[in-house]
């Protein structure tokens, strides 16, 4: 493929997993809406899907819409599978430094909160990120995005949260916007000022309350005025920000016009799932991690989903695996309860240094019991809904953005089967080829 055209016809697919039909939950999450056959093709015009189906039908649709087949660049899928471009709905894209030392400490028994309390964990990355230049952070972001693209990811949520002061958080959001302008990928910026209490507050007797006041009174107004962040996230967890503090921050964010999401119940039942359900009416899109939700939290998320205000449970199995956990988020309980489930990398230097959604899918199938079709829905259409983009990306149907991956195999089942590998032939973004493995 040349990469210069926005009008593209991919022919000869063995199957196309369209994920058409919107957000998946319950039994519907296992339906990838797959079209089979060696003559299935996808047509993109002007950066959007024009038609998908049997080759003769698609050709007729192209001509019926007044287009000439000669106007399309053609690409032979050679019997491979076509899926929507993958959507990574939870990443910490911009940071400086690595944390392999604490990884080794954890292997010897040190706990996450123990490392954080000693100034490690998030705080060590905050110090390194504050000290890094703009160009250093941009270079790291570019490298990571390139690796993600090569693994099939075309849309990426990117959080701030490694500065924890007004100027630094604004800088991270601005750098995210700059990367979005230069990258073929779509970046969705999230403000995460409430990621941890920074070192300069920790000597105070009221450290957490004082920092919550700073997030609400200083950081949020500046972020809203900047106009880059689309949503606000909070680390709602015992020992970080409790349910009451998280509610205050997220309510203020909603008043500022931001969508809501939260790190919820990662380490222990902390009321995060319940809070996410409570805030569904204020625009809460997702509750993430959920490795240790309460039964009440699962039920609350199921109720709002049934009521038509779904909050997506965005699960992060690579994090649990990298931390050496012996339990993972109860994905089957969420799906069986009718809660829509997404998967994401949680890319970050401390607890999930992975850039591969296919690897995340593999872990989810092995450790959480998801089927390959459920896992694919979780990194496409459901992940898109977790970002408020369900009407734009995440499925292959007319009018949707033409974000596509052509794989070197023909079945959905093989996608998580190839552990740690991404046998990709090509990645297309808005109808343009942006990656091709030769």
Positions of predicted regions on the chain:
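Histidine-centered catalytic micro-motifs
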Residues: 84-96, 160, 259-267
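N-terminal metal-binding scaffold of metallo-dependent hydrolase/deaminase domains
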Residues: 1-63, 414
